[in-house]
Amino acid sequence: MGNGSEESGSAAPTLTVAFVGAGEVARIFAAGIAAHAGATGRIVRFRGFNAGRRNRPPYAADFRELNAQTGITLADTVAEAVAGADIVFSSVVADQAESTGLAIAEALGTGVVDEAGVAGSVSGASATDGASTMDGAANSGAAPLVIDLNATTPEAIRTVKAALDTAGARFVDASIMDTVPVFRMGVPLCISGDPEAIAAFTAADLGFTNVRDLQAEAGTASTAKVLRSVVMKALEASLVESFRAAEKAGILDVVADSVVATFDDMLGRTLVDDLVKSEMLHARRRAAEMEGAVSTLEDLGVSAFVSAGARDHLAHIAELMHDRTPVAPEATPAEAIRNLG
């Protein structure tokens, strides 16, 4: 399925990378992979598919252009995006992770053949669409490697892996353990999966600089991510809940300054700013993530009182933000809180 085909006139095989979920993470990783590839004279091309609430086929011109800026050519279906891909990243909302993984498995298991009879060409796309120089991490004839970046449950990860095993693909459970826009290709990644899949991830040399191999089965990295979320999302939720009440009581500055002081001066100020504003932007996705956290904790025999509360709080914030424009990145936490009404 992964074809690792050579561009005509070039000794370097083309690595085709697909992003199912063509959002901010995909664009940052595509830019990083391309930069790493360019430094070594290798060839890569990118495809993407997105089915978000706002950005889905038929894509708006500005969304196509946004992805094109990092070399991603958008496809209209999952099957077109992953056809012939050597590496597939899955990065969607937590509650769509399992269904997306199964769709990828179905597409890879079936294969898509274009009019010329070549598996992996997106209809209407040339061999160089979205290409930048990158190398032969694409092993001719090798099974495609699917890298699941989703903050979903270990159970969902195992279900997806089983489907991909049946489809003949290799699978890596890769959990993002910090903020991608801040750390970019240096973001901490925990990975788990079968040894041959982990070896393929390492051999691909995509340019990630902070990878921790847990040397464990798929589902372990996602468990680490979920349990980290128990702390981080509950912390975000408690900050926003407290600050909203403080704003209504007319003492937002008093409460915020006290919290920041406890977190320790400038680091605390930056942390609190990021947590509060980040929640406004990603409440819906994080509510779905915390639904998975509640399920995981209960499966482990731990009562999920705090996580359930954080889930419900995030869902409420998502509803409040539904018809509101998020504040600008440079806005203060107070402005973000007031924007909720």
Region roles according to the model:
Residues 45, 73, 145, 170, ...:
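Conserved beta-strand segments of alpha/beta enzyme cores
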Residues 20, 114, 123, 152-232:
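Rossmann-fold dinucleotide-binding core
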Residues 78-170:
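Rossmann-fold NAD(P) dinucleotide-binding segment
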Residues 67, 164, 203-205, 246, ...:
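A generic structural signal for well-ordered alpha-helical segments
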Residues 327-341:
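Short, basic/aromatic-enriched C-terminal tail that caps enzymatic domains
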Residues 2-84:
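NAD(P)+-binding Rossmann beta1-loop-alpha1 motif at the extreme N-terminus of oxidoreductases
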Residues 13-15, 144, 187:
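Nucleotide donor/acceptor-binding cores
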Residues 224-329:
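Helical "substrate-binding/catalytic lid" subdomain
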